[in-house]
């Protein structure tokens, strides 16, 4: 989108409605038909980014499979989503700084990750930690690897990725 491209090029602090309109090839006034101001536009954008991430976790998810297989699917979904969407990967830190982004993330209840954690904890498989901490110890490794792989020449063969998936899974087990 125009917002993603502008953010990647200039950073979220340098965005203006005029620059976004130019990037989108529309008149500046047109944007104001949809958004009162830059903050509202960025908040809606933050909702969109988070919704895309939630949809990524859901892709090909099958809760009838063993918990590790469910976890592997979510990890791979994140990995491949970030490989296919390098602009999102480039903008991750900026997304986190968007107005209300943290609140948007916290206010989403019953998301796939939370449900997975509750069910796996109930089954006695996962450590009794918050969903946020479990995420940082596990699925966040996919995000960190994808981000660092852009700058460091990792040899990320499928067997290495599988090893990372298994090790990050063990990190959150009881």
What do these predicted ranges mean?
Residues 2-9, 52-60, 137-148:
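Solvent-exposed, amphipathic alpha-helical segments
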Residues 9-13, 85, 123:
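Short coil/turn segments at alpha/beta junctions that flank glycine-rich nucleotide-binding fingerprints
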Residues 38, 45, 49, 53, ...:
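Hydrophobic/aromatic residues within well-ordered alpha-helical segments
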Residues 44, 48, 58-84, 135-138, ...:
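Hydrophobic alpha-helical connector segments
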Residues 51, 77, 98-123, 128, ...:
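Amphipathic alpha-helical packing segments from all-alpha helical-bundle domains
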Residues 116, 167-174:
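C-terminal alpha-helix
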């Amino acid at each position: 989108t125009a917002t993603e491209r502008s953010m990647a090029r200039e950073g979220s602090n340098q965005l203006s409605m005029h620059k976004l309109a130019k990037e989108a090839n529309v008149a500046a006034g047109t944007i104001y038909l949809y958004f009162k101001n830059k903050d509202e536009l960025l908040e809606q954008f933050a909702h969109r980014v988070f919704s895309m991430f939630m949809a990524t976790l859901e892709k090909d998810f099958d809760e009838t499979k063993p918990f590790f297989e469910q976890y592997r699917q979510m990890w791979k979904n994140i990995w491949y989503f970030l490989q296919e969407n390098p602009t999102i990967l480039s903008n991750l830190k900026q997304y986190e700084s968007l107005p209300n982004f943290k609140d948007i993330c916290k206010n989403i209840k019953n998301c796939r990750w939370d449900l997975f954690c509750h069910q796996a904890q109930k089954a006695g498989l996962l450590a009794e930690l918050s969903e946020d901490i479990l995420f940082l110890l596990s699925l966040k490794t996919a995000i960190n690897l994808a981000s660092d792989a852009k700058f460091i020449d990792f040899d990320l063969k499928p067997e290495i990725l599988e090893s990372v998936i298994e090790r990050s899974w063990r990190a959150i087990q009881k």
